[in-house]
Amino acid sequence: MEKEIEIIVPFYDLDPMHVVWHGNYVKYMERGRCALLADCSMTYENMEKHGYAFPVVTMRVKYVKPAMFGQKIIVRTVHVPDENFLIFKYEILDAATRSKLCVAETKQMAIDIKTHESCFQLPEPFLTTFGGTK
Amino acid sequence: MEKEIEIIVPFYDLDPMHVVWHGNYVKYMERGRCALLADCSMTYENMEKHGYAFPVVTMRVKYVKPAMFGQKIIVRTVHVPDENFLIFKYEILDAATRSKLCVAETKQMAIDIKTHESCFQLPEPFLTTFGGTK
Amino acid sequence: MEKEIEIIVPFYDLDPMHVVWHGNYVKYMERGRCALLADCSMTYENMEKHGYAFPVVTMRVKYVKPAMFGQKIIVRTVHVPDENFLIFKYEILDAATRSKLCVAETKQMAIDIKTHESCFQLPEPFLTTFGGTK
Amino acid sequence: MEKEIEIIVPFYDLDPMHVVWHGNYVKYMERGRCALLADCSMTYENMEKHGYAFPVVTMRVKYVKPAMFGQKIIVRTVHVPDENFLIFKYEILDAATRSKLCVAETKQMAIDIKTHESCFQLPEPFLTTFGGTK
């Protein structure tokens, strides 16, 4: 599963160096991930209805080239099948040239909303959707 | 009731003009308000326990002078007694000179969390605490 | 001059009440304003080339109904002709029903970037573009 | 070199799960880093005076336990001597119990502000301050 969304860099995301402040890419990644999850009917609301939340447990980001005000950028989110975690890889690209601005990865763990217990394997129906094809 | 808190302007709040982005003052105002509310045991959690939320219904901000990176600023929050709304006035000042950077006002309305109904008068115990002295 | 843009409410803009945190509407307003300004070739970069910045000097916001996660909203930005300030009015609407979520107004003043002096009248070419029809 | 700062978790940093949104820890890390840098007279302004900017090139974050509204947290920032990069490690701790909420690492590279060229070794005076002792 993968998904591309386009974002136009807003003014309020810039820092005094006239580039996107590095922490704001985390927002772009979340927008990409939520768009992919919506495509497979796994919005946060649906996850909650199944009784689980999926907090991010690790995040790695590599910054390649800065994004500028008004620039059209693509967030390409790719799901990585895994039985234990919800794993996504991200590429943030310039929309015109598709040159890489940023690459990243996040890992999310299922938490039972009632008991607050962590799940070391994805519970159903998440295992079927995200667990890969053995 | 009034309260002063000190904030050191963080880098991530700046915009490309090297000053605090105007929308970020809303965060400073909320920090001032929450500090004042905590002093009178009216944290958001306590409000929720009493069954009410207090969304902001109007906000006015006047920007006088920009705040810069690393600047020590004071948020002075003053409660304005009122029977219908939770009203606060704010002054954001340079800590060293107390010169004015920003003045603002917010109005919050009580909402019954269960019924989602708006309260056109402050419910108890908020009326006693915030309603003024007549 | 007016302009409508569509925004899908992102997760990271929500607060614990499951609605958009009130300060985040300021970002939506800026995106609407920048889209309108781009349409008349008055991006912030162009303003800077003419030697002026336009900090927001006053802002008023009225919150009518909360916006939710994933909701499609419209920011309708309308320029109000004025010789002294850059004035915009905003309506934030539900995209499906066009019911009002938020109305707002901002006023921006021209500042000479070199001298840091405020302009009590819009300088050219801004006066011609934004000053109205007399 | 190391530095501890205290932060009280503000309401606007929370997400609908009533915990700090994962992207906001990046702000806490920056506040810790800037406090440490100020202690050794290496604020961003001073870096700029020397002709260099230090964009973050990689960031890794591991989330251990969520931070809540009003919680007092400590950001412990430790400089890791290195000749090529400005490297910091972070621990975000509950202030009362010092239990770990989050650990992270960032790497920053020197960029010559005039030429926009990356420096594969720290330039002076940064090499002396941050390069370690051999």
Task: Describe the predicted segments one by one.
Chain A
Residues 1-56, 111-134:
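Hot-dog-fold acyl-thioester-processing enzymes
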Residues 3-5, 68-69, 80-134:
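HotDog/MaoC-like acyl-thioester-processing domains
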Residues 36-87:
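Hydrophobic beta-strand-centered segment that forms part of the acyl-chain substrate-binding groove
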